[in-house]
């Protein structure tokens, strides 16, 4: 299940069966669906693992994005999943954007890159978050 036009297309091109593309208004900047139709569809779902990208993440604000419509969808995705995996490279740490869509307490795993400083890695682990350096 995805709201990303690019991910859905990539999986379909590889012959992956059963890809479910969420409807809604397509936001050209991110090639994702947003809006009430997207959020309503997500709210009817229950998934084992949710993957969500973040424009910024910090101990103070959690996960954030500059766009309110993206934040609404991302918030619904976080609440639909049993295990929540946030994806954000280390340059996004301590960057806070206009709209918070999840507190760090709602995140189980953060996948980031190896340039995350050790002290920041430790601070996230101290919050009970598994940090995967990829």
Model-derived features with residue positions:
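Active-site catalytic microenvironments in core metabolic enzymes, especially phosphate/sugar-handling
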Residues: 3
């Amino acid at each position: 299940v995805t709201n990303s036009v690019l991910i859905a297309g990539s999986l379909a091109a590889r012959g992956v069966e059963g890809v479910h593309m969420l409807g809604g208004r397509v936001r050209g900047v991110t090639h994702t669906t947003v809006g009430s139709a997207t959020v309503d569809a997500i709210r009817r779902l229950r998934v084992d693992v949710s993957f969500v990208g973040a424009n910024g993440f910090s101990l103070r604000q959690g996960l954030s994005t500059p766009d309110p419509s993206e934040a609404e969808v991302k918030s619904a995705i976080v609440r639909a999943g049993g295990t929540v995996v946030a994806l954000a490279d280390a340059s996004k740490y301590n960057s806070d954007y206009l709209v918070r869509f999840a507190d760090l307490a709602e995140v189980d795993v953060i996948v980031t890159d190896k340039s995350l400083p050790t002290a920041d890695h430790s601070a996230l682990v101290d919050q009970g978050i598994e940090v995967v350096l990829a």
